[in-house]
């Protein structure tokens, strides 16, 4: 219930932790842009921000970002990784809509030049998803995310159809796992080992 949700938010904030509401659906059906739906979604964001101190909201739809920015000028708005921000022009569009933070598409995780360009020219904070679980350029990803978006309105889970789909690809070529866009963080031990090897 809403009261339970607000209660959880209060506990988190009392612990000194910032709260980020994630509303990054990639599809909300045919009524997504209906006035009633928009008023409900933006009204919820406004109430959570103004009455309950929510600091951040994460959205995937640039139209919702624009509406949220107009309603809550001081709210931190983060563009979700599901916004598929995979180039400068797309990042610019989301910045103009009102996003101040972006989790870029995982295809940019290792493109340091473009990441720097986006950050410096648009003045936004960038976040990277380091534990990407999807295959690189997965043909099922868009449809999987749409299914999850629709299922989020129901009390049933999404099932495992897409897990099997991805599993079939990996079963045919296990190397696809290593082609995914996860980031491997070097530990101090491995860095020291590399320096030692270089010295030798």
Residue ranges of predicted features:
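Active-site pocket-lining/capping segments in soluble small-molecule metabolic enzymes
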Residues: 1-90, 103-200
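A cross-taxonomic marker for long C-terminal extensions/tails that follow the last structured domain
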Residues: 95-101
């Amino acid at each position: 219930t809403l009261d339970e949700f607000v209660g959880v938010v209060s506990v988190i904030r009392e612990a000194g932790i910032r709260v980020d509401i994630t509303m990054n659906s990639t599809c909300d059906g045919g009524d997504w842009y209906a006035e009633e739906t928009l008023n409900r979604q933006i009204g919820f964001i406004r109430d959570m921000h103004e009455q309950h101190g929510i600091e951040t909201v994460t959205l995937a739809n640039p139209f919702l970002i624009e509406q949220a920015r107009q309603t809550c000028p001081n709210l931190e708005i983060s563009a979700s990784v599901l916004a598929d921000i995979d180039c400068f022009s797309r990042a610019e569009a989301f910045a103009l809509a009102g996003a101040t933070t972006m989790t870029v598409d995982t295809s940019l995780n290792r493109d340091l030049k473009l990441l720097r360009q986006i950050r410096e020219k648009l003045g936004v904070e960038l976040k990277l998803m380091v534990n990407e679980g999807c295959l690189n350029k997965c043909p099922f990803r868009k449809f999987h995310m749409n299914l999850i978006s629709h299922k989020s309105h129901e009390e049933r889970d999404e099932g495992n159809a897409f897990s099997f789909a991805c599993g079939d690809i990996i079963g045919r070529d296990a190397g696809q796992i290593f082609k995914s866009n996860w980031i491997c963080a070097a530990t101090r031990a491995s860095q020291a080992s590399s320096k030692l090897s270089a010295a030798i």
